[in-house]
Design a protein with these regions (language model features):
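Non-catalytic DNA-binding core/recognition domains of DNA-processing enzymes
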Residues: 83, 105-106
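Short, basic interhelical loop/turn and adjoining N-cap
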Residues: 108-126
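Anion-binding and metal-coordination hotspots
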Residues: 2, 97-100, 105, 119, ...
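Alpha-helical support elements that line or immediately flank enzyme active sites
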Residues: 85-95
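N-terminal core-binding DNA-recognition domain of tyrosine recombinases/integrases
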Residues: 72, 95-97
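Basic, short loop/linker segments at the boundary and entry of helix-turn-helix/winged-helix-like folds
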Residues: 43-86, 463, 467
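Charged, often Cys/His-bearing segments associated with DNA-binding zinc-finger transcription factors
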Residues: 1-57, 451-475, 538-549
Length: 549
């Protein structure tokens, strides 16, 4: 049963099995249509983007990775996977739709040349080829929690970085908000929409099951009548009626419609937006608790979440980008995609956890949102130096950088003056150390004005932590010239989000986390190819930085 999800393609209610076969059309044959071009046409073709794509990108696509998506039985062979993946990248490069990509492959010789299909009697893409391939990838990821397309894009990025002689020893990181293509709904609109979708579904399945007083929800014009074409003073009464109708629907659907998506969204909406008090349903308030950013924003995209950042409201997703930098430019070598309430710090932790330990020291430059003692320690375990160009939170006194802690951070070994403490107790809950020194050590210490200990008759006490110590060290390093050069280098990654928004049309992203991530991966691959093409043609101008030397 599991194999049905990704081993079958359904067309006109007939199940079509497809077996995996590698693409044998890698070299130009004697009958290749390329031979029919004039010398002038061949020269123009070899100067175009298609030549770079055909020589560097297409051969680097690993078809075998995707063999698990197809049947191992003898059956009709699949469309060549490297042609499909190449087409998905070119589609984003020129902002084609699926249908436009299929049509242009038949008519544009540059596309055929780029995808090595000039020897094909018939171009291999049909109107459903790309969508079926995406569906196979989605189903495989759902079953096995492995994103084959993400791995493919990352491997292509690594190949491009190698061609551009970018070692990956210096990387920079930034995140970007991606808006879901949904309307901002008020709470009343959200409840109405969920009721309406369920009512339409019930009416379609069995018209007699929906009571007459609820049939108005199936009218496309009813939304405007209920929400907008009434006085604002009636809002409370309309809301009461909506909640009463919701309870009626809930009772009607308990036995028959629990397996439908519309019912699940309806129940989720009621559980998140309302509470039942003394037998009466009402809107949930802050005092009731349970109000959070994961609440459904619109049933058209139930995975989209809410986040407020830099004074702006966002509904949708967020992407995290890691860009490797070198003298010859930069390449996005990894990307992550999640709901927009996923923090930058979480992205970094997940990225480091899946990263293998680096053979050579690697630097990752980030902004303050990625900072933290745990992140720094995790990076160190992978032979990665985490450099944050700014810090969030409370300023740490500079003198704390000169305290010496044990490796676990549970004990202060020496103060800046070199004295060992008389006693030190670790407070597990706050992760701080309460440290006592002899009275005379602190009373006559030249650092007293900076440490500011509480001096008593026999002892002097100070409370500090290894986190504050590490923070003070970072603050001190930030004033160095090398650190300033790293900060200047990190600024470049902030051009990537604007580049993707401007040139790769994020507003056309499909709804849903899984589908959005797939399309975003194609955009990253297209962006990296453009960087490679500019490098090959000598079109890139890259500001040099001393840390790249």
């Amino acid at each position: 049963m599991l194999l049905l999800l990704y081993n079958r393609a359904i067309l006109e209610k007939k199940v079509i099995f497809m077996s995996f076969k590698e693409n044998s059309y890698q070299q130009i044959s004697f009958t290749d249509s390329f031979s029919g071009l004039t010398a002038r046409e061949q020269k123009a073709l070899e100067k175009s983007w298609a030549k770079v794509f055909a020589d560097e990108i297409f051969p680097a696509i690993d078809e075998k990775r995707f063999c698990v998506l197809y049947s191992n039985k003898a059956s009709r062979p699949n469309t060549p996977v490297n042609v499909i993946v190449g087409a998905l990248i070119i589609k984003e490069l020129f902002d084609y739709s699926d249908d436009e990509m299929v049509e242009n492959l038949m008519l544009d010789f540059r596309l055929q040349y780029a995808l090595h299909t000039t020897s094909f009697e018939e171009q291999p893409l049909s109107d459903k080829t790309l969508s079926r391939f995406r569906r196979r990838c989605y189903d495989y990821e759902t079953l096995h929690n492995k994103d084959l397309y993400h791995d493919c894009v990352n491997d292509l990025s690594a190949s491009i970085a190698k061609l551009m002689r970018i070692s990956g020893k210096i990387r920079r990181m930034d995140s970007m908000m991606i808006e879901s293509n949904i309307r901002k709904l008020s709470r009343m609109e959200l409840i109405y929409t969920c009721i309406s979708k369920l009512a339409v579904s019930m009416n379609k399945a069995n018209a007699s099951a929906l009571p007459e007083d609820l049939k108005h929800y199936t009218d496309p014009n009813d939304f405007n009548r209920v929400i907008y074409h009434q006085r604002s003073t009636d809002a409370e009464e309309r809301l009461k009626q909506l909640l009463a109708d919701a309870d009626k629907l809930l009772t009607l659907c308990e036995s028959e419609y629990q397996d439908s998506t519309e019912y699940d969204l309806f129940v989720r909406c009621l559980s998140e937006q309302t509470v039942v008090e003394n037998g009466t349903r009402r809107l949930r308030t802050k005092e009731d608790g349970g109000m959070n950013s994961s609440m459904m924003q619109n049933p058209s995209d139930p995975e989209a979440t809410f986040r407020s950042k830099a004074g702006k409201e966002h509904r949708g997703y967020t992407a995290n980008l890691e860009e490797s930098v070198g003298k010859n430019g930069s390449v996005v070598t990894d990307y992550q995609y999640d709901q927009n309430n996923h923090s930058d710090s979480q992205f970094l932790q997940e990225h480091l956890e899946q990263m293998e330990k680096q053979e050579e020291r690697t630097v990752i430059i980030t902004d303050g949102a990625y900072s933290g003692t745990e992140n720094t320690q995790l990076a160190s375990e992978k032979n990665v130096e985490l450099i944050t160009t700014s810090l969030t939170g409370k300023f740490a006194p500079d003198i704390l950088a000169d305290f010496e802690f044990n490796e676990e951070g549970t004990k202060v070994l020496r103060c800046p003056a070199g004295y060992a403490p008389k006693s030190c107790s670790y407070m597990k809950q706050s992760r701080q150390c309460a440290v006592s020194f002899l009275h005379e050590q602190c009373a006559n210490c030249p650092y007293q004005d900076q440490c500011k200990p509480k001096i008593f008759k026999r002892v002097a006490k100070i409370v500090t932590s290894k986190a504050a110590h590490e923070r003070a060290k970072i603050q001190r390093d930030m004033s160095s010239e090398e650190y300033k050069n790293y900060a200047r280098l990190r600024n470049g990654v902030e051009t990537v989000p604007s580049n993707i928004r401007r040139n790769y049309h994020l507003e056309k992203m499909p709804r849903g986390k899984q589908r959005g991530k797939f399309f975003f991966g194609s955009k990253i691959a297209a962006l990296n190819f453009r960087k490679l093409f500019n490098y090959v043609k000598g079109l890139g101008n890259y500001a040099q930085n001393p840390v790249l030397a």
